[in-house]
C-alpha cells in the first residue's frame, strides 16, 4: 500500500526510525532519487557501530538494486574515507561479490562493483588522489542540470530551496550517463599523446654524437631546463582538466625533477652522471625510471600532479592492486648494496641527516595528507597481513597431514619476522576501535607454539593465538611514533618482489633455494649423505647479513631493533636469538615448498618418491621441536587442579578447552611482550570455505534476533559469534573460548574411563555424567546454576534453529561452555538447504532425551523454565517479524548462497514459520504441542545422530 508523501517525510524525520527500517525504506524507494537522498541523509544520524553491523546490507543495496541515485555510493565512500575499519570491511565484501559475479561481466551488478571497488582502492592505497587530483564535479546529465537551473531561478522567492537541492545536484551531477563525450575526448587525447611521444623519440634519435664529457654537462643543463618548463606546464594543464579522459600521459620527468630537488648535492651529481651516461646515443630509458613507473599505482607518492583522467582510468580498470608486501629484512639489502657501491655514509652522517629529516615531512605537508599517509600505511599492512594468513591455509592443503603442523609453524614464524610487530589489527574480531576518540590495537606477534591445524575433510583451517597491545595506535600525525612512520613511508625504498622469500612464486623460490643448497660450498659441508633438511644451513649468507646489519649502527635493522628495545624492553635473552628462529622458519618453509613440488611431480608410485618424501617429513618434524618451547614446569604451577592437560587434549577442542584466563596468564608469562601493561591475547580460526559468507549471514541473523529479545527484556542467552569475511571463500572466525563440543566431551570422558579401567563395558558417557563430574551433585548450587544456564540457552537456540531452519545439528556442531550454556556453531545449512538435500532432521529443533535428563525430567523446574523461555522468545520475535523477514528478503535477491536455494520463497516460508495468524494464547499451545512435543526424543534426531556416529565417528 503506497504511503502518502507527507507521511513518508514524517517517518524519515522521526527519531523512532531504526536503522534497519531506514535500510528497508531504501530498498522500497530505490527508484525515487529524492526520497533516496533523504533516507541516505538519515543514515548519518546513526552510530558507527550500527552502521558497521549492516555493511552487508548496504553492499547488497548498492550491487543488486538498480537505481539512478548516487546517494548511497557517496555515503559509503564518505565513511570509507573517514573510518579505516569501515573501508576494509567494505573492500573485502566487494571482493567476495566480484568473485561471485565473475561470469557476468556485462551485468549491472558487476559493473557497479568494479567501479566502486576501484574508487575504494584509491582511498585505501593511494595518498595523492584526494589532494592533487580533482575529478569533474558535473557531467553531461540533463536532470541535475534542470534541477540546478530551477533552484537558481526559484532562489529569488524561496532562498532555502538551495539547501535541499544542492546535495542532490552535487551528487547526481557526478553520474556519467553517456560515454559519447568520453570516447571522443579519449580519441583526441590518444592522438595527441602519440604525436608528442613520436616527436620526443625523433628528437632523441637525431641527437648528435658528442664526447662523453661534453654530453654530461650539456645534457644535464638541458634536462633540468626541460623538466622545469614541463613541471610548470603540467601544473597549469592539470588545473584546467575538465573531462576524466583528457590526459593519459605519465609524468616520470616531473617526478624525477621533484625528487632531484630534494636530494643532497652530492647524491644529485652522482645520480645525474649515471643517468646521463645511460642516455648517451640511446633512446632507452633508465631502469630507475622504469621501475618507478611499474609500481606507480601502489607507491605512496607517485606523480604528484597526475590528471583527473588517470584517476578515472584507475577506477575503471578491471584488475585489483598487487600490494607490495614490504619486509623489514629487505631494508637490509639496500644497506648492503650501498656498502658494496661505496655510497653509504658513516654512522655520524646518518645521525645528522636523520635529525635534519625527522619532522620535515610533518612540517611541509598539510594535516589531511599526513593523516592519509598513516591510513594508507595501515591499509596496506592490514591487507598484506590478511593475505598472508589466507595463503598459509591454501599452502597447507597440499602438504601431507603429518607435516602440516611443522609447515604451519614455519609460515607463522616467517610472518612474525617479516611483518610483525606492526600497525595492524583485526576489524570486528578485536574490540571496536573505529570511533573517533578511540585508538586501534597493535598486533605484536603470532604465538607459534599454541597454533594448531584443525581437523577438516577438505580445507585446512588452523587456530591462531594473537598477541596484541590494546588501544595502542592512532592516526595522529604529530605523535613521535607516527612521525617516524610518515618519514619511513615517504623515504621507503621500492622493493622488487623477487627479494621476498615469502612471495607467491613458489617455483622461483624453490629453484633459488635448490641452487643455493647444491652450489654453496659452505652449505655442502653441513649436511650428511642422507641430506636431512634439519641439518642443512640453507640461509647462512642471510644469517651473516642479518648479523652485519644489526651490528651496523646506521642500518635500518639496527635502528629498528634499538627502537624496539627501548619500547618493549630487552628481549634477546628471552627469545634465545632471533637469527636462529628465522633460519629455522626459512628451512621449514623450504622443506614445505619442496614437499609440495614433490607431491605435484606425478611420480608418487616410485620407491624414490616415497623415500624422499619420508626424509623431508622427518626433517620437518625434527625442526618443529626447535621452535620456542612450552615451559611445562610453569604450566604445572599455573594449574589449579591436579589433572594433566596432556591427557585431556585428545582433539583440537582440547586446545580450546583450557581455561582462557589461565591460558592468557601462561602465555603472558612466557611472552617477550608480556610485561607491557596493555598486552592482551586474541584467539581466531583462519578458515577457507565456500560457506563462510553464509555463516557470517547466519551469525548476523542470530545477533539481530538477540537484539530483539534484549529490546523486549526476554530472559535469553546466546553467544554472539563474529566472522570477518576477507574474500569469497576465506575469512577469520572468532574462537569460542572456555567451551568444548558435546562430541569431544563424550569421547574424552568415555576413552579416559576405559583407559583407567573404570568402564569395562565401554558405556558412552552422558551429559548428566559430565555435569555431575564438573559441577558436583545434583543438589549443589553450582549444579543448579549450570542447569538453569543450560535451560535458558537451550530454549534460545531451539527457537533460533526452528525459525531459521538451522540443520546439521550433530554433537560436533553443538558446544558447552564452562558455565553450562549450550552454543550452536557451523551454520552451513539454514533457511532452505539441508545436508545432502535429505530431510533427515524433520523435528522442529534438537531436544534429545539426554537434554531432558540434564534438565531433571519433564516435570522439573529447569524444564518448565525451558518451556517458558521458548514461549517468551517466540512471542517477541512475532512482534518484530518485519525485521527478520525484511533482511532475508533483502539479501536473497541475486544471491548465490545455498541458503537461498528457494529464491523468493525463502522469505515467504520464514514468515509462515512465525505463525502470524495465531493469537498469543494459540501460540502457547503451538509451542508446547507442535514444537516441543514433536522435538522431545524425536526418532529423526536419533537417526541423524546414529548416522553421524557411523559415517563420521561423531558421538551421539
Swiss-Prot record:
<keyword id="KW-0547">Nucleotide-binding</keyword>
<dbReference type="InterPro" id="IPR011009">
    <property type="entry name" value="Kinase-like_dom_sf"/>
</dbReference>
<dbReference type="InterPro" id="IPR021601">
    <property type="entry name" value="Phosphatidylino_kinase_fungi"/>
</dbReference>
<comment type="function">
    <text>Acts on phosphatidylinositol (PI) in the first committed step in the production of the second messenger inositol 1,4,5,-trisphosphate.</text>
</comment>
<feature type="region of interest" description="G-loop">
    <location>
        <begin position="664"/>
        <end position="670"/>
    </location>
</feature>
<dbReference type="GO" id="GO:2000786">
    <property type="term" value="P:positive regulation of autophagosome assembly"/>
</dbReference>
<protein>
    <recommendedName>
        <fullName>Phosphatidylinositol 4-kinase PIK1a</fullName>
        <ecNumber>2.7.1.67</ecNumber>
    </recommendedName>
</protein>
<dbReference type="InterPro" id="IPR000403">
    <property type="entry name" value="PI3/4_kinase_cat_dom"/>
</dbReference>
<dbReference type="InterPro" id="IPR015433">
    <property type="entry name" value="PI_Kinase"/>
</dbReference>
<feature type="domain" description="PI3K/PI4K catalytic">
    <location>
        <begin position="658"/>
        <end position="939"/>
    </location>
</feature>
<dbReference type="InterPro" id="IPR042236">
    <property type="entry name" value="PI3K_accessory_sf"/>
</dbReference>
<dbReference type="GO" id="GO:0043001">
    <property type="term" value="P:Golgi to plasma membrane protein transport"/>
</dbReference>
<dbReference type="GO" id="GO:0044182">
    <property type="term" value="P:filamentous growth of a population of unicellular organisms"/>
</dbReference>
<feature type="domain" description="PIK helical">
    <location>
        <begin position="1"/>
        <end position="120"/>
    </location>
</feature>
<dbReference type="InterPro" id="IPR016024">
    <property type="entry name" value="ARM-type_fold"/>
</dbReference>
<dbReference type="GO" id="GO:0140504">
    <property type="term" value="P:microlipophagy"/>
</dbReference>
<comment type="similarity">
    <text>Belongs to the PI3/PI4-kinase family. Type III PI4K subfamily.</text>
</comment>
<dbReference type="GO" id="GO:0005802">
    <property type="term" value="C:trans-Golgi network"/>
</dbReference>
<feature type="region of interest" description="Disordered">
    <location>
        <begin position="545"/>
        <end position="573"/>
    </location>
</feature>
<dbReference type="GO" id="GO:0004430">
    <property type="term" value="F:1-phosphatidylinositol 4-kinase activity"/>
</dbReference>
<dbReference type="GO" id="GO:0016020">
    <property type="term" value="C:membrane"/>
</dbReference>
<dbReference type="InterPro" id="IPR018936">
    <property type="entry name" value="PI3/4_kinase_CS"/>
</dbReference>
<dbReference type="GO" id="GO:0042998">
    <property type="term" value="P:positive regulation of Golgi to plasma membrane protein transport"/>
</dbReference>
<dbReference type="InterPro" id="IPR049160">
    <property type="entry name" value="PI4KB-PIK1_PIK"/>
</dbReference>
<dbReference type="GO" id="GO:0005634">
    <property type="term" value="C:nucleus"/>
</dbReference>
<dbReference type="InterPro" id="IPR036940">
    <property type="entry name" value="PI3/4_kinase_cat_sf"/>
</dbReference>
<dbReference type="Pfam" id="PF11522">
    <property type="entry name" value="Pik1"/>
</dbReference>
<dbReference type="GO" id="GO:0006995">
    <property type="term" value="P:cellular response to nitrogen starvation"/>
</dbReference>
<feature type="region of interest" description="Catalytic loop">
    <location>
        <begin position="805"/>
        <end position="813"/>
    </location>
</feature>
<dbReference type="GO" id="GO:0044011">
    <property type="term" value="P:single-species biofilm formation on inanimate substrate"/>
</dbReference>
<dbReference type="GO" id="GO:0005737">
    <property type="term" value="C:cytoplasm"/>
</dbReference>
<keyword id="KW-0067">ATP-binding</keyword>
<keyword id="KW-0539">Nucleus</keyword>
<dbReference type="GO" id="GO:0050714">
    <property type="term" value="P:positive regulation of protein secretion"/>
</dbReference>
<dbReference type="GO" id="GO:0005524">
    <property type="term" value="F:ATP binding"/>
</dbReference>
<dbReference type="Pfam" id="PF00454">
    <property type="entry name" value="PI3_PI4_kinase"/>
</dbReference>
<dbReference type="GO" id="GO:0046854">
    <property type="term" value="P:phosphatidylinositol phosphate biosynthetic process"/>
</dbReference>
<dbReference type="InterPro" id="IPR001263">
    <property type="entry name" value="PI3K_accessory_dom"/>
</dbReference>
<dbReference type="Pfam" id="PF21245">
    <property type="entry name" value="PI4KB-PIK1_PIK"/>
</dbReference>
<keyword id="KW-0418">Kinase</keyword>
<dbReference type="GO" id="GO:0048015">
    <property type="term" value="P:phosphatidylinositol-mediated signaling"/>
</dbReference>
<dbReference type="GO" id="GO:0006897">
    <property type="term" value="P:endocytosis"/>
</dbReference>
